[in-house]
UniProtKB/Swiss-Prot annotation:
It is found in: Cytoplasm. InterPro entries: Cytidine_deaminase-like, FdhD. Coiled coil: none annotated. PANTHER family: FORMATE DEHYDROGENASE, SULFUR CARRIER PROTEIN FDHD. NCBIfam families: fdhD_narQ. Belongs to the FdhD family. The active site is at C107. One of its GO terms (biological process) is Mo-molybdopterin cofactor biosynthetic process. GO terms for molecular function: sulfur carrier activity; sulfurtransferase activity. One of its GO terms (cellular component) is cytoplasm. Required for formate dehydrogenase (FDH) activity. Acts as a sulfur carrier protein that transfers sulfur from IscS to the molybdenum cofactor prior to its insertion into FDH. It comes from Staphylococcus aureus (strain MRSA252). This is Sulfur carrier protein FdhD. Keywords: Cytoplasm, Molybdenum cofactor biosynthesis.
Length: 265
């Protein structure tokens, strides 16, 4: 069962020279502890929606699973904040950490963890998809118009997957990584191949987000914000087209521009 993503709370507002009582929408932070084969794996701070997708996508992003068939069962106990996962295999030595991990909603993992575990799971894109400039602008416009909770609270990241024409999944979360993990989990649950799909994202394209996109397997990532230098380097290395600053009818292509074609061609 999904809990409320946002809740109305009393506040004091200052406007037009006056203080007055009113209500405002706060986004909900929900700690979810993931247990794998009876052992604590991680605690993720997230929005309390689509939690099974989040758990599956998170485990796949971490390299704990590679496909749906490796999952024996996933039980979400949202009343207690636990996800109980049983796998059809052992986790292996590299997941036997001496300390428990908490993945915060606002940031990624340490650089040491990123290089040791993430690089092995990232995929070089073999995507053949091409997009016109108008398709890019239309997809970003649709993402922003579909994000009604963000418009109410200003506190959620939004992400979607598209074939270039329509969205087939759209997810929101307080954590940018979580929003992408929910997309990933959705695809794994349904055995959806994402090689020729587009990731549309509301946040900045950091190196960690680029790596996450590579893990999911997309060939194009679109954002209304700019990428970092390391993200562009990784995008070039992993054959991913990164497009940013999509606003006011324009955008910048930072890597592999061959997938963006003139609409008149």
């Amino acid at each position: 069962m999904n809990k409320d993503v946002s809740l109305g709370q009393p506040i004091v507002r200052y406007e037009d020279g006056k203080l007055f009582n009113t209500t405002d929408q706060y986004v909900t932070e929900f700690p979810l502890t993931i247990m794998v084969n009876g052992e604590e794996f991680a605690t993720v701070i997230c929005s309390p929606t689509n939690l099974e997708e989040l758990v599956i996508g998170f485990l796949a992003s971490e390299g704990a699973i590679l496909k749906r068939d490796e999952l024996k069962s996933v039980l979400i106990d949202d009343s207690k904040g636990f996800a109980h996962v049983e796998l059809n295999k052992d986790l292996g030595d590299r997941f036997q950490y001496s300390t428990k991990r908490m993945i915060a909603s606002c940031c990624g993992k340490s650089r040491e963890f990123y290089f040791q575990n993430d690089a092995a799971v990232a995929k070089t894109s073999m995507s053949k998809i091409t997009l016109t400039p108008q398709q890019i602008i239309n997809m970003m416009t649709r993402l922003q118009s579909a994000s009604h909770i963000y418009q109410e609270t200003g506190g959620l990241h939004n992400a979607a997957l598209s074939d270039g024409l329509t969205f087939f999944v759209h997810r929101q979360d307080i954590g940018r990584h979580n929003a992408l993990d929910k997309l990933y989990g959705f695809c794994i649950q349904r055995h959806i191949t994402v090689r020729d799909k587009v990731l549309i994202f509301s946040g900045r394209i950091s190196s960690e987000i680029l790596i996450k996109a590579a893990k999911i397997g997309v060939g194009v990532i679109l954002s209304k914000s700019a990428p970092t230098t390391l993200a562009v380097t990784l995008a070039n290395d992993l054959n991913i087209t990164a497009v940013g600053f999509i606003r006011n009818g324009g955008f910048n292509i930072y890597s592999h521009p061959e997938r963006i074609i003139d609409s008149e061609q």
